[in-house]
Amino acid sequence: MREIVHIQAGQCGNQIGAKFWEVISDEHGIDPTGSYHGDSDLQLERINVYYNEATGNKYVPRAILVDLEPGTMDSVRSGPFGQIFRPDNFVFGQSGAGNNWAKGHYTEGAELVDSVLDVVRKESESCDCLQGFQLTHSLGGGTGSGMGTLLISKIREEYPDRIMNTFSVMPSPKVSDTVVEPYNATLSVHQLVENTDETYCIDNEALYDICFRTLKLTTPTYGDLNHLVSATMSGVTTCLRFPGQLNADLRKLAVNMVPFPRLHFFMPGFAPLTSRGSQQYRALTVPELTQQMFDSKNMMAACDPRHGRYLTVAAIFRGRMSMKEVDEQMLNVQNKNSSYFVEWIPNNVKTAVCDIPPRGLKMSATFIGNSTAIQELFKRISEQFTAMFRRKAFLHWYTGEGMDEMEFTEAESNMNDLVSEYQQYQDATADEQGEFEEEEGEDEA
């Protein structure tokens, strides 16, 4: 089997990670004690991707929980599925990172990282054929962003040929915990560009807007935001967990989705959107699902796809539906909106269908888009970064941990380069592709 080792780092990472395990355990018929009570062979066919089978037919998540303070992990442990995790896989410090990327990456986090890597090794050794790692973390804090990116680069060193996939929560001024979020996020993106194969950008701003506008929740809590994240993560990993036609393992997904190595930041989407506790009573049709799925209001990253163009798209439909109808609808979207798909990658939309719908829905659709409009998100963070960095505000917290201003300047320019790369491919057309490559050659010279 092709196993995936899951790592969750920091407060946000542990909260969305715990939620993810609740949702997929439920989908696979696994109760909080790790016993199977399902009703379909499909639930067990690829259970080994995310679970170890222990003695007594207990299924244990291949999950590693990491944090620099014990608080969040205590609440995971006492949460609904807290007892399903392997106790040795909780790795935590006592000091906390204080929302400081430098503490997570260079000082506090660096002290803890070896004990995390021991657990990673142990999990990887119990795998038959490890396909890769997935990390849930946020980019705004200290542990998930600083230590999360440190773990990525260490794991990259040790397992260079394995896929590294992250679910990264981007900070937003609308749901802000700290003033230094733009610093932490920029320093993290600097690492993610170089060291991951696939990054799902989950943006608090977009989640907030969905809760507020679409779900009509007046004061959305993190619980409501995490409900959306877990629905999306469940959808995105469907192809990895259930037998399907487009049997995406992480590597096949990367091959389909990433045309240029640096441009691996995906915009996830989900339809139909429902709030916690209220499920829709009307089954949606395939055309409605398709239409909703491509709508900017359903995107989990606060970017409007109409402001850019899609390099590649993957769509995952779940539930009993006609494959023919799905294919027709997907072609329909592409034909009607052809200007929003780059014409120099033909057939850049791939579709998978899985028979098992998520709990409480007859059918659902998950969207993964590699769109040049994601640059809006990086621009937003970059502007906030520059505003503070120009005045060297709050820098002493970072230099005090041994960082150099140079690193900030490098991270800033790497992020700006990323934005211009997206822009360059947005403007590229099929016929000028030749000239375009010559220019690239000159730049490098």
Curated annotation (Swiss-Prot):
Residues bearing N6-acetyllysine are: 58
Instruction: List the molecular function annotations (GO) for this entry.
Output: GTP binding; GTPase activity; metal ion binding; protein heterodimerization activity; structural constituent of cytoskeleton
| Post-translational changes noted in the entry | Some glutamate residues at the C-terminus are polyglycylated, resulting in polyglycine chains on the gamma-carboxyl group. Glycylation is mainly limited to tubulin incorporated into axonemes (cilia and flagella) whereas glutamylation is prevalent in neuronal cells, centrioles, axonemes, and the mitotic spindle. Both modifications can coexist on the same protein on adjacent residues, and lowering polyglycylation levels increases polyglutamylation, and reciprocally. The precise function of polyglycylation is still unclear.
Single Gene Ontology BP annotation: microtubule-based process
The intrachain disulfides are none
Protein's UniProt keywords contain GTP-binding:
yes
Q: What are the required cofactors?
A: Mg(2+)
Q: Disordered: where is this region? A: 422-445
Q: Which residues carry this modification: N6-succinyllysine?
A: 58
According to the UniProt record, list the residues that bear Phosphothreonine.
Answer: 55, 285, 290
Q: Which UniProt keywords apply?
A: Acetylation, Cytoplasm, Cytoskeleton, GTP-binding, Isopeptide bond, Magnesium, Metal-binding, Methylation, Microtubule, Neurogenesis, Nucleotide-binding, Phosphoprotein, Ubl conjugation
Described function: Tubulin is the major constituent of microtubules, a cylinder consisting of laterally associated linear protofilaments composed of alpha- and beta-tubulin heterodimers. Microtubules grow by the addition of GTP-tubulin dimers to the microtubule end, where a stabilizing cap forms. Below the cap, tubulin dimers are in GDP-bound state, owing to GTPase activity of alpha-tubulin. Implicated in neuronal migration.
What information about domains appears in the record's comments?
A: The MREI motif is common among all beta-tubulin isoforms and may be critical for tubulin autoregulation.
Name under which the protein is recorded? Tubulin beta-2B chain
What organism does this protein naturally occur in? Answer: Bos taurus (Bovine)
Origin organism lineage: Eukaryota, Metazoa, Chordata, Craniata, Vertebrata
